[in-house]
Amino acid sequence: MSEDLDERSLRYHASEPRGKLAVTVTKPMATQSDLSLAYSPGVAAPCLAIARDASKASLYTARGNLIAVITNGTAVLGLGAIGALASKPVMEGKAALFKKFADIDVFDIEIEERDPQRFCDIVAGLEATFGGINLEDIKAPECFHIERTLRERLSIPVFHDDQHGTAIVCAAAVVSGLKVVGKTLAESRLVTSGAGAAALACLDLLVSMGLPKKNITVSDKVGVVYAGRTEEMDEYKARYARDTEARTLSDMIEGADIFLGLSAPNVLRPQDCTKMADKPLILALANPTPEIMPEDVKAVRPDAIVCTGRSDYPNQVNNVLCFPFIFRGALDVGATAINEEMKMACVHALSAIAESEPSDVVKRAYADQMLSFGPEYLLPKPFDPRLITEVSAAVARAAMESGVATRPIEDFRAYRRRLSRYVYRSSAVMEPIFERAREQPRRVVYGEGEDDRTLQAAQQIVDTGIAVPILIGREAIIAARAKELSLRMRVGENIQVVDPQTAPRLAAYSDRYYQLMARHGVSPGRAEQVVRSSRTVYAALMLREGDVDAMLCGTVGPFRQHLRRVREIIGKAEGVRDLSTLVGLILPHGTYFVCDTHITLDPSAEELAEMAVLSVDEVRRFGIEPKVALLSHSNFGTYNNPHSRKVRKAVRMLRGRYPELQIDGEMHGEAAISERIRKLRFPDARLRDNANLLVMPNMDAAHISYTLLKQIGGGVSVGPILLGAAAPIHILTESSTVRGIVNMTAYTVVQAQIREAAS
C-alpha cells in the first residue's frame, strides 16, 4: 500500500465522526410522552409481550434487522493475525457494506479470544441480541470448528463469509461459465490451487450442486493433496485427498475443465493453461495479483474464460454480490439458519441475473458496457439494482421451502417492491454513474478553475479517475492555491490549465463567438473582449469546438449569467422547446428528483410536460425507474383554477403521449411521496409506490422545496442537471459543495459517453 494511500485512509477514518459507523434513534424522542413510550413505564409492554412469545422480538425491537459481524482477528484480509482490536476498521467496513447494499444494521464485535471453544461460548451468549451472525477473518482450520459449533448451538443464521460468500459467487461464475461453453457440472473436471477455508467451501458447495468428488484434485503450497499425505493435513482437507500419482499443479491440470485458484500470485503458468481441456474456465482469485493474469491466459488460450477478484477485469468474483442479500432474505423470513438450499438459491439467482436480458434501467445505468451473457459477463455488476430483489427473494423462498423460515412471506410481489426501495436509500445511487465514468474518462472543462471547491473536486476526480480535469484560470494562481490546500495534483501532469488571456486558441474562439453573436450587436472587438474576460464563454467555446467533451460552470456568479452564455454558445438540442433543470436529492430515506428549480418561472402545461419527459430520461441514467408526480395546491381536482388546470392539462398530455409512464397528478406533495395517503384520497391513482420524480408547478415551488429538503433533510444533491442542451454542459450553483461538483462531473462524463456513442 502506498504511503499516499495510507495517509488518505488515516485521514478518512480520523475525520469526525471517528470510524465508519454510528447508532441512530428511529422513533420520536421529542416529548415526555415519547420518552414514556420509549423507556419506562411504556417499555414494559413489549418486554412482557416478548417474554410470552419470543418471536415478537422481531416485531418490537431492532433484532430482526440486526446482525453481528464477529471476529477474533486471526486472519484479517492480507494482514494476518493482527488481533481483535486492530481488525476493528475492517469489521466496521464490513458493517458499512451490509448497511449500504441491503440496509441491514450491524454491530461489529471484536473478541480477543483464540481458543475456539471459549470463542464459541462468548458468541453463543449474544444470540438474544442479534437476528444473525456473520463470522469474519477467522483462520483455518479453527473457523470450521467455530462455525459448525455455533450453527449447532444457535437458532439464528451463522455464516462465515470468507468461506461461503466466496463459495457462492465462485459457484455462480462456474455455473454461468459452463453454460457459456456448453458443458455440465457433472461431466467437468476441476483442479484447485489452495486448500484453505474459502477453497474447501467452494468445493463443498460445488459438490452439493452436482460436481462429482472424484472429478476434483486439490493442491496447496506443499503440493497435491493425495491419499496418504501427512504433511500439513487436517480432517477438512483430507476429505478431498485422491489416490493419484500427480504431485504438482502442472501434473494434475492435464485435461481439466476448471481451474480454481485461491492461493498465491503467479502459481499457474501459461504452459499449464495449454494442457487444459477445450474452452477452460479459469478462476484466478488471489488478490491483488492473481494466480495468472488474464492477458497471459488469453495469449496462449484465447478460448478460455477468465475470472479474477479484481474490478479492472471482466468477471470479478466479489463477495459483495452475495453476503448483503443472503442475510437480507434470511432476516426477512426469520430464518434459523443459512443452509445449503439457500446458498444454492443464491448461486442460481446470481447466474440468472447475468444470463437474463437486462432491463432498460440496468442498461442505462451501465450503458455501453458488454452486459450480454457470455465469456466476459458471467456475473452481475456489484451495483446491479436487481441483486437485492432477485437474490434476497430467492434466498427467502429457499428458506421457506427448506423449512427454516419462522416468518414466511405471503406476497412475494409486495416483498420485491419493498426490497427495491433499499436501492435508493443512500449514495449507492451514484455508484453506477461513477463506475461507468471510470471506464471511459472524458475531458471536462471547469469554468471556475481558481475556486477552492473546484480545485478540491479536481483532486478527487484525479484520484478516482472519472475525468481529465481542464481548469480555466491563471496557472500561477491555481498552482499556488493547490499548494495552500495541500493538494497533490500538478499542472501539466494530471490536470490541465487554460488561461484565456494567453491561450493560443483565443483568436479562433473570438472569431467563432463573433460569428455566433454578430447579429446580436457584438462587434469583432467586443467578441475578443468577451472571450478573453468571460471564463464561462471560453469554456463553452472549447466544448462547442470539440476541444473538450463536457463542461461545468456556475460555482461563482449568478446562475442566470451563466445560463445566458450557455444559450448563446451551446443552445438547445434539436426538438427541445426550452432549457430546464432537474435536481437530485439523495436523502437517508430515499432519492428524489425535482424540476424545474432554476430556469422557467411559470411554465405552461406544454413546458411542464416537456421537462417531465426530459427528466424521465435523466432519472433512468441513475438506474432508477421514474415514478412521476405533478404537484399542485390542488389534490386530484379539489381546486379548479388556472394553476390547477395547467397541471391537469400537462398530466393529460403526458398520459396520451407516454402511456407506459408511471405518472399522475395534480396532487399534494404528501400524496406524492406516501402511497398510503394517496390511496385514502384517490384510490384509483395510476401511480404505484412512492413518487421519486416531482414536477413542480413553477420555479418558486421547485426551488424552495429543493433547498429546504437539502438543508433540513441532510441530503446530498446532484445537479442542477441542465435539461435540453445541445451538448453535455451543466450550470452548478454558488452553494455547490466539493462532493456536488464531483457527482456532477461523473454524471457529465456519462452524458458525454452516451452522446458520443449515439453520434
Where are these predicted regions, by residue range?
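Adenosine-phosphate binding glycine-rich loop
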Residues: P157, D161-D162, V181-E187, A284-S392, ...
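Anion-binding alpha/beta catalytic cores of soluble intermediary-metabolism enzymes, centered on
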Residues: L85, D137-T184, T406-I409, R416-S759
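Rossmann-like adenosine-cofactor binding region
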Residues: K237-I305, R310-D312
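A short, aliphatic-rich alpha-helical micro-motif
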Residues: E127, L185, M252-I253, C273-M276, ...
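NAD(P)-binding Rossmann-fold cofactor-contacting core
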Residues: S193, M209-Y236
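Glycine-rich adenosine-cofactor-binding loop
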Residues: L66-G78, G83, A167-A171, V181-V207
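N-terminal ligand-binding/catalytic initiation module
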Residues: S2-V158, R397-A398, A405, E431-L455, ...
